[in-house]
């Protein structure tokens, strides 16, 4: 089943089994007649955001990605998260005595980056500090990869501010419409960010 043993299997293997599962699901979806395998996108939050950053360096299957509150560099994350016990446990030590920090950091695979990415983060996120997203966005911009960064000023590890949730969803719809097609987002994301429209 999907109990504690299943969850524990991820520890020390951040970009391993989960990545394999994601790609198996992607392969299966690509066989469905109503799925256009040439126009697939992926999004994730927290560890899911980490996985989006990991996908960035390990597959070209997706036309675009969206990473929310995701880990980019495990080494710099170690000294800045409110939960220092978590990387100590998950990565079996500290950056100076465990090779897992480098092995499982998306930042270690920057030379493979190429997929357009929406990056969202909360300035009050102490779990995955928003500087992780700043580092990731800086890397994408330096590589001239189409990317957008939205920092939610009053939010932490989840967009809980009243005005943040509509922006959160609209920004995703806008990004996926831009790269995958389909119906456009209901509002102009740029105007939402600049508080130029009421919503």
Regions picked out by a protein language model, each given a short descriptive name:
Residues 1-199:
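Active-site-proximal cap/loop segments of hydrolase catalytic domains
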